[in-house]
Amino acid sequence: EIAQCLVGSEMCIRDRPVPYALAPAENFAMGGVALLTALGNVQEISFGSECGDIRLLSQAAEACRVCKTDYADVMDDFLRSGYSYPEVLSQMVGQLYGAETAAVLRHPNNTLAIAYLNAIHEMDSPLRPMTIQRRGAGHNSSQPGPDGTASATYIRQFFADGGDCRRMMPSYAWHALREAQQAGHVASMSYLERLILYKLRTTDPDELHDIAEIGQGLEHRLYKAKRSASLEELLQTIRTKRYPMARLRRILLHILLDIRTADIQNYPAYGRILAFNDTGREILKDSKEKRLLPFSHSLAELAHTSPTAGRCAALESQATDIYQLARPVIGQGESDFRRKITISGGTHHAAPESQS
C-alpha cells in the first residue's frame, strides 16, 4: 500500500509517530509541522480546508490564539459549566472577530488547517502555508456528493458493508484496498474490543489520569464504566456533550497503547522515512546537512538517538503489534523493527513487509 502512494505522486512518505497520529488536531498538526521544519529544506506546507481562503484561515487562527491566551479564564468558566470546547471557542471568536471568522470554526478541515497555522506560528517555522479547497462531499458526510465524490467516513462504512467503491477513489487506491481485503489485512476496531475492555478493567483511575486527552474527571467515568460488556455500551455510558464520540474513541486507543499526556506535549524526537521515489531521494539528500532531528527508515536506529526517541519507538512498535491483531488474518508481532523501506524509481523497488 505504501508503494501505491508513490504511484499516486507522493515523493517522500514519512511516518508521523503514533502519539501524534492519534492526537487531537493541535498536536497532530504540531507533529507534522515539526517534522517538515526539521528536514531543513522544505519551504511550503499545504493542507485542505472547506473555505479555501488562507487569509480567512489565518485570521481565524489568530482569533483562536487570542481567545486561548487573553481570555483563558473566561473559557475555563464556560467549560466548567458544561459547554463543549468548540462551542465556547466559536462563541468567543464570534464576539471578538465577527460571524464570518467564527463560521470558519464550524468545519472540521478548517479546524485542522487552523491548527497547522497555529503550529507554524508557535514554532516560528519558515514554512509557507497554502490551502486547497475541499469540494464535493463533506468531511463526515453519510452520502456521496452531487459530483460522485464521497467522504472517507462514507467510503469506509460502504466498503465494510460490502459495497463497490471503486468509482469513489483512484484506481491504484482501490486495487490496494481490494488486495488488502482479500489477504485479510483490513483492520477494524471491532477486533480490538476485548483487548480494550481488558485494558480498562485492569487500569486504575490514577493511571487513567495520565492518559492523553483525559481530564475533568473523565478517568472516574471510565473506571466506573469498566464493567461494560461491549465497546458500544462503554461509549454510550461515558459519552457527554464535552466528550464527543470521536474523541472518546481516540482516548480508548490511547488507553490501549498507553499513550500519555507527556507523549504528545513535546515535539517529535525523530522522523521516520517509510518510502521515497527519485525526487524524494533528492530531497532527502539535500536535507542531510540541514536536519534538526534524526531521520532514518530504521526504527531500531532511531530508538537509540535519545531517551524520548526510545519511548516513542517503543510506542510505535507496540501499536504495530496491536494493529496486527486488529485484522481478520492476524499478522506477526515485532514487525515494525524489521520493516524495509520502499524505494520507487527506475527499476529499483523494494517492497515493505506486508501491512495495510
Regions found by a protein language model. Give the residues of each.
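Single conserved hydrophobic/aromatic residue that forms the stacking wall/gate
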Residues: 1-8, 12-15
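Active-site cores that bind ATP or allylic diphosphates and position pyrophosphate for catalysis
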Residues: 17-356
